[in-house]
């Protein structure tokens, strides 16, 4: 039994292990919805560099885990928001140690920092500069974020690395 994680790197490691367990025992893909919003409380107090390092390790790990049937990568997806969507702002924010610590609206900066770090990791690619195979990156396009600064960054990333998916919400 693992206690609830207290740090972002531990949370992302557990999510990666969950992907691997899913891929080894079940068929079909696995996804985490609003990934950056739910992870945001764990990024509180981190610098951008620390946050990006955690995200990069998570994505690299997802591309090294040949544990699915036939020694394949786990078919996995991350659903990403540009910020905390309106419908989540008043929800209790579960954070380090499994403790409710405010509302998700208290973690807008952290959710956006995770999105920005992820976009940078996607743009940089792997150690050879090639696109990451998994997880699939699915960005939620919501009217409330159409003019968000990270929307422009997403388009720059897609121009270089056309692997992210866009979901019109």
What are these regions (language model features)?
Residues 1-169:
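Conserved catalytic cores of very large enzyme subunits
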């Amino acid at each position: 039994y693992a206690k609830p994680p207290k740090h972002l790197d531990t949370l992302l490691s557990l999510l990666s292990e969950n992907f691997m367990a899913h891929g080894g025992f079940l068929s079909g893909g696995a996804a985490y919805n609003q990934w950056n919003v739910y992870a945001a409380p764990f990024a509180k107090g981190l610098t951008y560099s620390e946050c990006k390092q955690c995200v990069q390790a998570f994505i690299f790990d997802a591309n090294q885990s040949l544990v699915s049937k036939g020694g394949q990568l786990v078919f996995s997806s991350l659903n990403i928001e540009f910020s905390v969507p309106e419908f989540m702002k008043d929800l209790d924010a579960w954070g380090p140690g499994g403790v409710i610590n405010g509302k998700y609206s208290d973690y807008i900066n952290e959710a956006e920092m995770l999105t920005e770090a992820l976009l940078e990791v996607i743009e940089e690619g792997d150690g050879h500069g090639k696109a990451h195979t998994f997880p699939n990156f699915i960005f939620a396009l919501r009217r409330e974020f159409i003019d968000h600064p990270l929307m422009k960054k997403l388009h720059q990333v897609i121009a270089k690395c056309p692997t992210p998916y866009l979901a019109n919400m």
